[in-house]
């Protein structure tokens, strides 16, 4: 499947609001890489998915920041369950930090560290 086909596949499964968050978070990852602020694959950023569920997007483990796209971001719940099929795993350490912040601060739309 080509990258554009993957984008269409994911885009067709999410709301317009979630797609916008995915685009913005992927851009954030790429900016971090461009400025050299990443730590290879061991840094994490996450964004809350708009809506009533406690879901957020986090980077796919194993991809470099400059490889991140809206479609490669992984959607998880606060228990670490992947809620939208993804071929990518997540980093448990990154999940632990971000889920704790998102659980404690429902007003936080994005967490960067």
Regions found by a protein language model. Give the residues of each.
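An anion-binding catalytic pocket shared by soluble metabolic enzymes
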Residues: 22-112
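Generic N-terminal amphipathic, Lys/Arg-enriched alpha-helix
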Residues: 2-16, 28
């Amino acid at each position: 499947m080509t990258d554009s086909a993957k984008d269409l596949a994911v885009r067709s499964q999410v709301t317009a609001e979630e797609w916008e968050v995915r685009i913005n978070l992927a851009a954030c990852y790429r900016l971090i890489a461009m400025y050299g602020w990443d730590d290879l694959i061991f840094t994490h950023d996450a964004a809350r998915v708009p809506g009533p569920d406690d879901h957020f997007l986090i980077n796919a483990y194993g991809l470099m920041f400059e490889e991140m796209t809206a479609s490669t971001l992984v959607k998880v719940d606060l228990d670490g369950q992947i809620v939208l099929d993804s071929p990518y795993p997540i980093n448990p350490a990154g999940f632990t930090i971000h889920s704790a912040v998102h659980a404690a601060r429902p007003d936080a739309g994005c967490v960067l560290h």
